[in-house]
């Protein structure tokens, strides 16, 4: 059994900014500059669909696996010596279109998670194929579960059944529902006894929808460790595993959690 208290601290950077609508190259240039401002960190988190904005034009915008954004992320991760993650529109090997989070490591390996819950109010379920499985990544011994935007509303999918240390959400969450974002994120940390980090965008997209940001990091009691508000920029925070280990030892509610199976 691993000793969570002995894990090193984890320094993460949240990149909250505007997105150029359907302009991959402009977004590459913008994010390359912002990633350079993060300094020495372990993990850099970008918004959902960070190369295009939240778009249903998957037919024209989807890029292949190992396409330009895979290559760009590999280069940026190597340059920053950090994991870089965010979601993009991908055409999978089976031809389906996915809202796919890419997890680019500095050694060149890329892992991924496909968004499970597609936002039907925008017709996302008509243009994309949902993911079939939960995913957990490891970084410096930390167990990290990635999720994308609308996934936040479904607590069973976020449920920590694998001793997750950090729930990581990347999003294009509109300002009209910012109250829900700010209420649900601390709930996920409290119910799962883990840290939560969430990145949203700011500005207005090509369809006229406004985004309020509110990127944030919360601890296992739902307490705020970082809040970006509506600002555009790069925000860093250090997570301490020893604090999480101590809290779980004092309040092991996870031992009484109900068992379940996902179908």
What does each of the following model-derived ranges do?
Residues 1-43:
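N-terminal glycine-/serine-/threonine-rich phosphate-binding loop
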Residues 52, 102, 113-119, 216, ...:
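Short beta->alpha transition motifs characteristic of CBS
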Residues 86-88, 100-103, 135-137, 215-217, ...:
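Short beta-strand scaffold segments in enzyme catalytic cores
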Residues 92-162, 176-183, 246-253, 263:
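Active-site catalytic loop in hydrolytic enzyme cores
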Residues 68-85, 153-235:
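CN hydrolase (nitrilase-like) catalytic-core segments centered on the catalytic cysteine
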Residues 2-12, 136-145, 166:
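Beta-strand-turn-beta hairpins that frame and shape the catalytic cleft
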Residues 44-45, 143-148, 168-170, 197:
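Short hydrophobic-aromatic micro-motifs
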Residues 24, 32-109, 174-188, 194:
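Cys-nucleophile CN-hydrolase/nitrilase-fold catalytic domain and related Cys-dependent amidase chemistry
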